[in-house]
Structures are given as structure tokens and as C-alpha cells.
Amino acid sequence: MKGLLAGTIAAATFAVASAGEYCGQWDWAKSTQYTVYNNLWNKNAAASGSQCTGVDKISGSTIGWHTSYTWTGGAATEVKSYSNAALIFSPKQIKNIKTIPTKMKYSYSHSSGTFVADVSYDLFTSSTATGKNEYEIMIWLAAYGGAGPISSTGKAIATVTIGSNSFKLYKGPNGSTTVFSFVATKTITNFTADLQKFLTYLVNSQGLPSSQYLITLEAGTEPFVGTNAKMTVSSYSAAVN
């Protein structure tokens, strides 16, 4: 595919990707604006399974991609992977961000049986442009099969409306990182938003320092368990202004 590089994190050289899929734990494909990761970071939590990801199209700032997997056995409450499209951008302090426009349209299919997964944006911030993750902000568009976010209490700390969508907000620790998770009250498969509004809410209402740098912006799916599952993102775009 023209304009796309493929490889692994450890690879020393890259090759132009074909329209095929990549299935290695840390495989990825890269365009000028996005890196699409397979990212099977917790595959050993499953008794068996595999996952493959592929980029379908690139048109300007919009990308289309998909990921297919089967994860069975093991802990049904543990995420196995996070196949995602990560925006390539320079870190920027929240107080200096004007807008974070994004669009994401997707569909999800799976075989009968237990299926647990979420579809989510994942943002990380740090006190410096090159620092470690201090805050994680997740925006869940879907929580399939009872998937639940990190939470100290198991209960939402607030219900907020951002744009035209309602979300329940959860808070909890992941090691030394404070995690805020906005979980949509109903599944959203065609999402258009300014993600800066989520950050502004957290700054104004939940104590997120506006001096934090946004260092990562990703969107994808976290599967817990599922057979012959496939998420197809027909169009995705994001920018940090």
C-alpha cells in the first residue's frame, strides 16, 4: 500500500506494506499521520488465541483499518490486546490545546458465545513532554458483554454530557497512573467530537492539571474474550490543534 510502512518495533529496516495483515505481537504499520499497532501486549493472559490487524485505506488525514481475533480461556476479566491507530503528533500542554477534532466510524462482528470487548480512545498525559505516563484518559464508545473500566469503587463518580453523548465517568489507579474512563451510556458506532472538551471537563471538575502534556492519542479496541471477532474501522481521523 503506497505511503505505508510495516515492520516490528525491533526491526532495523522497513518495507512497503501490502494490503495483507500483520499478526506478530508487536507488529505495526505506519503512514505519515498514524501508526496502526497490533499490540498483543497481554496475550499470555489467554489460554489460546491470535490476532491480526491490517490497514485498508489512507485518504488524506483519514485512515481505514481492521483487526480480527480469537481469544479464549484464561481470565475473562483481563484485556488481551489493544489494536489501535495512534496519532503522530508533538506533545502539547493541555492549556495550549485549542481543539482535538476526531471522527471514528466502525462496525463489530463476532461468532456466538461469550464476547467481551470495548472500543475506546486512549490518551496519556505527563508533566513533561518526554515524561512517563501520569494520567490516562479513556473514552469508551462501546462496552460489549459487560466490559468494565478501571475503577477504585466499581461505581461511576459522575455522569456527564459532552457534545450530544452521555458518559459515566470512572476513576481508578493503574500502578502510578491515574485513570479516568468516560464510558458511553449507549453504544456509539459513528463518533464525531472534540476530545479537548473531555480534557477541559477533567481540568475544571476532576483536578487534572492543565499544565500536563498530552503525549499519546490512540483509538482502537480492547478484547477480553471472543471468537472470530472483527472490528472494521471504515474511517478514522484525529488531530491536535
Curated annotation (Swiss-Prot):
Short name of one Pfam family: Glyco_hydro_12
Glycosites: 174, 190
Record's catalysed reaction(s): xyloglucan + H2O = xyloglucan oligosaccharides
BP GO terms, sorted: polysaccharide catabolic process
Signal peptide range in chain numbering: 1-19
UniProt KW DNA repair keyword: no
Regulation of activity: The xyloglucanase activity is inhibited by the binding of the host apoplastic glucanase inhibitor GIP2.
Keyword Glycoprotein: yes
Record's keyword terms, sorted: Carbohydrate metabolism, Glycoprotein, Glycosidase, Hydrolase, Polysaccharide degradation, Signal, Virulence
EC number: 3.2.1.151
Classification via PANTHER family: BLR1656 PROTEIN, XYLOGLUCAN-SPECIFIC ENDO-BETA-1,4-GLUCANASE A
Role description: Glycoside hydrolase that exhibits xyloglucanase activity. Acts as an important virulence factor during P.parasitica infection of its host Nicotiana benthamiana. Also acts as a pathogen-associated molecular pattern (PAMP) in host species, where it can trigger defense responses including cell death. The PAMP activity is independent of its xyloglucanase activity. With paralog XLP1, is required to elevate apoplastic sugar during P.parasitica infection.
The protein's name in its UniProt record: Xyloglucan-specific endo-beta-1,4-glucanase 1
Annotated source species: Phytophthora nicotianae (strain INRA-310) (Phytophthora parasitica)
Origin organism lineage: Eukaryota, Sar, Stramenopiles, Oomycota, Peronosporales
